[in-house]
Each structure stands twice: as structure tokens, then as C-alpha cells.
Amino acid sequence: MPERQVTFVDTNVLASAHDRSEPRKQGIAQAMLDALWRDRAGVISTQVLQEFYVVATGKFGPPMPRGRAREVVALYAEWPVVQIDLLLDLAASELEDRHTLSFWDALILEAARRAGTTRLLTEDLEHGRRIGGVSIENPFA
């Protein structure tokens, strides 16, 4: 049996799974997340959960009701959740400089590294790029 690949999920993939305005992306994201649930291989961070709540309740068309958004956050909090702290912030700022990234993208990458994952699902970074031992995969590419 192949070893499961633990995967860090960025906000845009989580949000796409719950955003009805783009059915193609929603289907792809839901399939990816379903597989991670089945394999118990998903990891997330407090940053992702916070951003999801803000996006879902403010940018979805129509916005997700706050109570439902809290339910989704609580559901994904069952996954391993990387807590963002000062050491992670500092490591991300160094990664930001080394790889010419936005601070927020560097913070996602550092959270993925801290969790020990080697795969990051995101549409914000270059598909196929590898940074700090983490392979970037855009499921919508």
C-alpha cells in the first residue's frame, strides 16, 4: 500500500470547495478535500481558517451565513492545525526574502513545512515549483 501524502491546503482551495459561483473549481476542490478526508491526510493552519471565514462571509456571491462559516471552520479544525506564532512569522519573513514571495504566501509555506508536509495545494504560487522541500500544486491548472 502506498504511503499517504500529507497535504497542506491553502485558503483558496478550501474556499473554492464551498463557493458555488465557480462550479468547475468547486467540483475539483471538493474532490481534493474529499480524498484528504478519506486518507486523513489534510493539514491546515489558523491563518487558512481565519481567511476562509472572512472570504466565505464577505466575498462569496451570495455570502455564506456566519453560522455556516463557523461550522465549516469547526469541521476543518478537526484536521491537524498549525498555530501561527512569532517564530513562524519570523521564518516566513526570511522565506519571503529568499524566494521573493508575499509575506502571506511565505507564511503558508512555512506552516506547511512546520507540519512536515511536502505538498501544498494552492492557486497562489507557481504550479510545480518546489520551495523549502514543499511541492506546490495548483489543482485548477
Which residues does each predicted region cover?
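Short, well-structured N-terminal submotif of metal-dependent ribonuclease cores
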Residues: M1-I44, K59-G67, E71
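Acidic, PIN/NYN-like endoribonuclease modules and their adjacent C-terminal/linker elements
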Residues: M1-V6, L109-A141
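Anionic group-transfer/hydrolysis microenvironments
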Residues: N12-L14, H18, Q47, Y53, ...
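Alpha-helix C-capping/helix-to-loop hinge sites
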Residues: A17, A35-D39, V55-K59, L75-P80, ...
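General small-molecule cofactor/ligand-binding pocket signal
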Residues: V43, V82, E137
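Acidic catalytic patch
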Residues: T46-Q50, R70-R98
